[in-house]
């Protein structure tokens, strides 16, 4: 297995690729503000190339765009935004036979269910559960054990609209829907995940691109850029495309606080994940 290559700048390799799948949280922003170097890098990518923002946000892309506008990240920086929420909606609309669901998550994610012909109901009347995250950003996982036990007792299938386990909002760590779903699985519950790192998320993205641009997608020309080994990089591995690992994102504390050499950390992780390129932060 080849060792990962450190990039002093994206400009060293960007000519090899035509499509860039760029993660948002941890690469473009930290939940509060954008990273200036990341914006400069995206600005420098030629217009003939495509920048596709992909996110495990459990909401439709138009809802995420409103948040991006608030942190001054507008549409001129990219061609398309696709979320795990978009794929979840596609599944619920086209493949879900059951119509009554229980929503396990905050009200801010309710846009996920608009115009799907589904009925939000109590747990007692639900046919399945859709999990979008914790109700309060400060919640611990233990708070959800009682409701998960009730869901398991009814033997309901859970749809997880965000496979991420945690996220860093500024300097604070918060649990995501993926952590609740994993806890439910440990109880013996059945979960279907939508988003990174699952192959069908990338297949869905490529189908959207093919329809929009009316041409076949060459996977050899795709570069995935992300900071999460378990979702972004593993997802690139699953889809068999090249990747650029941003080590200064969600995994930063694993090497930075331990005074571990970045290159040694990445090489060690390369035993479990195939990492092609890496940077501390996305830099042109």
Give the positions of each predicted feature.
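N-terminal phosphate-binding loop and flanking beta/alpha elements of the actin-like ATPase fold
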Residues: 50
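Polytopic endomembrane small-metabolite transporters, centered on the Drug/Metabolite Transporter
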Residues: 83-85
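Substrate-engagement module of ASCE P-loop NTPases
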Residues: 45-47
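Asp-based, Mg2+/Mn2+-dependent phosphohydrolase catalytic module
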Residues: 1-22, 30-33, 39-43, 66-79, ...
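Canonical radical SAM enzyme core domain
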Residues: 57-61
């Amino acid at each position: 297995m080849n060792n990962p290559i450190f990039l002093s700048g994206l400009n060293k390799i960007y000519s090899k690729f035509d499509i860039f799948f760029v993660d948002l949280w941890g690469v473009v922003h930290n939940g509060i503000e954008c990273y200036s170097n990341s914006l400069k890098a995206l600005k420098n990518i030629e217009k003939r190339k495509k920048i596709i923002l992909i996110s495990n946000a459990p909401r439709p892309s138009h809802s995420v765009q409103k948040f991006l506008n608030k942190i001054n990240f507008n549409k001129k920086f990219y061609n398309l935004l696709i979320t795990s929420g978009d794929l979840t909606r596609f599944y619920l609309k086209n493949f879900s036979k059951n119509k009554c669901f229980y929503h396990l998550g905050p009200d801010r994610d309710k846009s996920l269910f608009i115009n799907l012909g589904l009925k939000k109901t109590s747990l007692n009347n639900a046919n399945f559960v859709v999990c979008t995250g914790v109700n309060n950003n400060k919640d611990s996982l233990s708070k959800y054990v009682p409701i998960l036990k009730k869901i398991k007792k009814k033997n309901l299938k859970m749809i997880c609209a965000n496979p991420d386990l945690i996220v860093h909002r500024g300097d604070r760590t918060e649990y995501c829907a993926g952590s609740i779903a994993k806890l439910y699985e440990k109880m013996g519950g059945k979960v279907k995940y939508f988003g990174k790192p699952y192959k069908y998320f990338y297949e869905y993205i490529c189908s959207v691109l093919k329809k929009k641009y009316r041409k076949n997608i060459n996977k050899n020309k795709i570069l995935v850029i992300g900071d999460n080994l378990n979702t972004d990089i593993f997802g690139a591995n699953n889809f068999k495309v090249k990747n650029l690992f941003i080590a200064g994102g969600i995994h930063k504390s694993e090497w930075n606080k331990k005074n571990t050499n970045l290159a040694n950390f990445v090489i060690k992780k390369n035993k479990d994940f195939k990492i092609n390129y890496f940077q501390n932060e996305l830099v042109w």
